């Protein structure tokens, strides 16, 4: 295990030892505490040694990457799975965080009911990562990072701009999903990891998996894209625009330069979270949990300012908890990046088949019947294009009522699909 320099746990990539000495076979960032768990996990930080050229034409430097690892790296360094998070996710994917968040990062419908008090420190995909789980840490070395533009340790709008000595704010460069993936590639280079056994993620994480397969076809053996797509539908673009405009319309956004002022756009950010959260659910799941039940069981209160229905109170709770852990500018930049994502436009001159022509990775696609934000049709179109090209692709559509959040909730049904897919892979 290589030593981390600095009291903040950071390591300057420019001073890293030789790549062959950087990660020992035992370099997990956690210690096991109970069966099936990767244990208590400490987030680490690494600074990339070189600037990154972005799709917008700008360069960014320095770049700090927050990361966690689970499992044991094989001597041949050929058992690595990179897990990529969704818009509201972060670096902490599995186990119990050594430093718990102020608010739970466990998304998914009724996550608090499911997780109880442990939710504040539990990784967002803990049910999928660990010994004997879908991404089996007895076999694989799983790496999770916070994406570029994030607010949980990786360089983003809240980071210091070296040109001014102040947080970037809205001076942060506009980024794309491809920029996120190039950053991940540069990070793995510093860890001496050349090839990935798999790249996996749900939602925006699945988009990153496909970017990996297209940008680095000779460096990725498999991808697992769950509840994802090749391009978000116009309705999804519209919902994301509404969420961003809620933030932009908040006077406390202050043109994006709100850091250190004592005011931040919590009202707009809260509305953005409400909008986003509803798109992650389904009419069926909302109806089953809340129906039209009143917040106060006796009667309506004749108020236009306070929640009258339980579902309204639930949304307010979601908003209040989200603003405690997430930065509004990160939401703006990440939301914009995922709406830009369009494989056919980026790589195929409008043709999805042409965009995927050079992909060599085996592909597992999992979609959910009630997901209207990333509907199964997107996964079906990806599967059809890959089959047209004679690629190795597997598609499963799970009948489930929870909407887009199924990828965080249907872990028990996803697990055998992922396990069987990865079992066909030689490591």
Q: Could you describe each region identified by the protein language model?
A:
Residues 2, 13, 19-83, 92, ...:
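Catalytic-loop region of hydrolases
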Residues 68, 76-161:
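N-terminal cap/lid subdomain of alpha/beta-hydrolase-fold enzymes
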Residues 167, 171, 178-197:
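Conserved acidic catalytic loop of the alpha/beta-hydrolase fold
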Residues 195-234:
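Conserved hydrolase catalytic core segment
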Residues 225-321:
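Alpha/beta-hydrolase-fold enzymes
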Residues 346-352, 375-385:
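Short alpha-helix in the alpha/beta-hydrolase fold that links the catalytic acid
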Residues 359, 365-367:
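Short beta-strand/loop motif that positions the catalytic acidic residue
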Residues 389-427:
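Catalytic active-site module of serine/aspartate enzymes centered on a nucleophile-bearing elbow/loop
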């Amino acid at each position: 295990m290589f030593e981390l320099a600095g009291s903040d746990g950071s390591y300057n990539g420019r001073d890293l030892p030789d790549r062959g000495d950087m990660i020992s076979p035992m370099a997990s960032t956690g210690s096991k505490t109970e069966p099936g768990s990767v244990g208590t996990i400490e987030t680490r930080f690494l600074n990339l040694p070189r600037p990154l050229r972005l799709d917008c034409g700008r360069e960014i430097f320095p770049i700090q990457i927050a990361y966690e690892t689970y499992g044991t790296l094989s001597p041949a360094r050929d058992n690595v799975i990179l897990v990529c998070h969704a818009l509201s996710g972060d670096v902490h994917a599995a186990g119990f965080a050594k430093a718990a968040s102020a608010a739970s990062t466990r998304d998914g419908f009724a996550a608090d009911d499911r997780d109880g008090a442990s939710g504040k420190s539990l990784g967002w995909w803990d049910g999928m990562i660990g010994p004997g789980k879908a991404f089996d840490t007895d076999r694989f070395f799983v790496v999770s990072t916070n994406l570029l533009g994030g607010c949980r340790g990786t360089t983003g709008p809240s980071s210091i701009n070296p040109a001014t000595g102040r947080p970037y704010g809205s001076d942060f460069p506009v980024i794309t999903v491809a920029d996120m993936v190039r950053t991940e590639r540069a990070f793995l280079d510093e860890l001496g990891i050349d090839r990935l056994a798999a790249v996996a993620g749900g939602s925006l994480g699945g988009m990153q998996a496909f970017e990996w397969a297209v940008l680095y076809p000779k460096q990725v053996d498999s991808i697992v894209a769950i509840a994802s797509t090749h391009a978000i539908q116009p309705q999804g673009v519209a919902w994301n625009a509404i969420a961003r405009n809620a933030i932009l319309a908040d006077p406390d956004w202050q043109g994006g330069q709100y850091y250190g002022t004592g005011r931040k756009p919590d009202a707009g950010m809260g509305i953005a979270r409400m909008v986003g959260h509803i798109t992650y659910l389904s009419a069926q799941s909302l109806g089953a949990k809340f129906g039209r039940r009143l917040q106060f069981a006796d009667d309506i209160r004749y108020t236009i300012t306070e929640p009258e229905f339980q579902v309204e109170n639930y949304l307010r709770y979601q908003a209040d908890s989200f603003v405690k852990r997430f930065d509004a500018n990160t939401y703006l930049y990440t939301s914009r990046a995922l709406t830009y994502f369009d494989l056919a436009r980026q790589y195929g001159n409008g043709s999805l088949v042409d965009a995927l022509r050079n992909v060599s990775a085996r592909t597992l696609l999992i979609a959910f019947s009630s997901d209207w934000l990333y509907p199964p049709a997107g996964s079906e179109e990806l599967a059809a294009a890959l089959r047209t090209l004679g690629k190795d692709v597997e598609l499963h559509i799970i009948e489930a009522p929870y909407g887009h959040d199924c990828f965080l909730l249907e872990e028990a049904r996803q697990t055998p699909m992922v396990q069987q897919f990865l079992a066909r892979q030689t490591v």
